Regions:
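Beta-strand/loop substructures that line and gate deep hydrophobic ligand-binding cavities in soluble
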Residues: 84-174
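A conserved amphipathic terminal alpha-helix motif
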Residues: 163-210
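Generic recognition of cysteine residues
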Residues: 16, 33, 37, 134, ...
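Short, surface-exposed, polar/charged, turn-prone segments marking secondary-structure boundaries
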Residues: 69-71, 78-81, 137, 173-179
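Hydrophobic ligand-binding cavity/cleft-lining segments
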Residues: 1-88
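Noncatalytic linker/hinge segments flanking ATPase motor cores
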Residues: 50-53, 91-98, 132-133, 137, ...
Length: 210
């Protein structure tokens, strides 16, 4: 049965877009902020990342979820009429006048051809994940971050779950997965905010000591 989860979050960081971009571009560091992540691996020759997560099924049985993604980064403009994505994104946000026009987009796209994954544990499944992180430069020199993620995971149903109507079970499983993802995303961003605050404080102390 395929389970689909979605999450979206928004946070404002007390750092400029340059500093925020450096942090969010560090794929391994960012993913490790996810409380369910147990391993991140980069395959340099393929330019793809492998994530390994430990979650639980509806009966609290452990599941190992593996994802392969490729990271892409690009800039976009909120006020350029020729920038289709920028115009679409600008229509979604409120108080657009509080932002500078130039913004950054980081995408994690699912990879369909990937290395074979061997696991010593049962209930290991390879899923698909896609994320979009948009960093907007506020005019007060802070960074507004929009983080959206979609995943899908196809796993086998164990007894007695396989006796339930699949439609009902899928609805429940999708809701649980989305709840887990939302909590994980919010936890990640809290860790990011903490790291950036600590980094800013360290820089202030260093500057003050000179």
């Amino acid at each position: 049965m395929e389970v689909v989860g979605k999450s979206n979050a928004h946070i404002i960081l007390d750092s400029c877009i340059h500093e925020s971009s450096i942090y969010f571009s560090d794929h391994e560091k960012l993913i490790k902020c996810n409380p369910y992540c147990t391993n991140v691996k980069y395959f340099m020759e393929l330019d793809i990342f492998q994530w390994v997560f430990q979650v639980s099924d509806p009966r609290s049985h452990p599941i190992t979820a593996v994802f392969f993604v490729r990271q892409q980064e690009e800039s976009f403009s909120l006020d350029d009429p020729l920038d289709t994505y920028g115009q679409m994104f600008s229509a979604k946000i409120k108080n657009g006048t509080t932002f500078h026009s130039k913004a950054k987009r980081i995408r994690w796209s699912p990879v369909h051809e990937y290395p074979e994954f061997e696991s010593d544990t049962p209930n290991t499944f390879v899923g698909k994940a896609s994320s979009e992180i948009c960093l907007l430069h506020q005019k007060d020199d802070r960074t507004s971050v929009y983080f959206d993620t979609d995943i899908s995971l196809d796993f086998d149903l164990s007894f007695p779950l396989n006796l339930m109507p699949e439609g009902i079970l899928k609805f429940m499983s999708d809701a649980i997965m989305s709840q887990i993802m939302q909590q994980a995303t919010e936890s990640m961003l809290c860790q990011v905010k903490s790291d950036i605050c600590c980094s800013t404080a360290d820089m202030a102390i260093t500057s003050g000591g000179k």
